[in-house]
């Protein structure tokens, strides 16, 4: 065994921007709590904003999306129709961020926000190992 075998790789926190409809705040909270589990190699630095959708919000939001490496869109019943979610996703693509969706309600009809379709982003069912793999893939 050489010197380098003793060095463990330095893990960086994943800076994740979570785009969601406020009706699905419970899902955002659950995702962040599940990410804290020692069972999974997953950490979030939460950059989501919960303020009115206006110019000031957009400026702050763009800064936070820019600081993140990934945008996750939590797809609930009405996510597809939310102006702020669509703006966040389009801004994420514009800034060159990795973007993917997570379906919150597996047994219900879920419509995806148009940017996820337009940019052919992957969408997964809620499953932490799958989310971890998606975050760690190139």
Q: Where on the chain are the PLM-derived regions?
A:
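Short beta-alpha junction loops
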Residues: 78, 99-109
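C-terminal interaction surface of TIR/SEFIR-family domains
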Residues: 1-17, 106-138
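Short, glycine/charged-enriched secondary-structure capping and boundary segments
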Residues: 31-34, 86-89, 114-117
């Amino acid at each position: 065994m050489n010197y380098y075998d003793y060095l463990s790789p330095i893990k960086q926190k994943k800076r994740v921007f979570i785009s969601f409809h406020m009706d699905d705040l419970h899902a955002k909270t659950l995702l962040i709590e599940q990410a804290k589990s020692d069972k999974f190699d997953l950490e979030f630095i939460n950059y989501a904003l919960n303020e009115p959708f206006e110019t000031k919000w957009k400026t702050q939001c763009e800064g936070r999306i820019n600081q993140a490496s990934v945008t996750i869109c939590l797809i609930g019943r009405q996510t597809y129709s939310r102006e702020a979610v669509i703006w966040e996703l389009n801004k994420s693509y514009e800034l060159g961020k990795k973007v993917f969706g997570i379906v919150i309600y597996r047994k219900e009809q879920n419509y995806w926000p148009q940017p996820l379709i337009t940019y052919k982003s992957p969408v997964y069912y809620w499953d932490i190992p799958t989310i971890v793999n998606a975050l760690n893939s190139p």
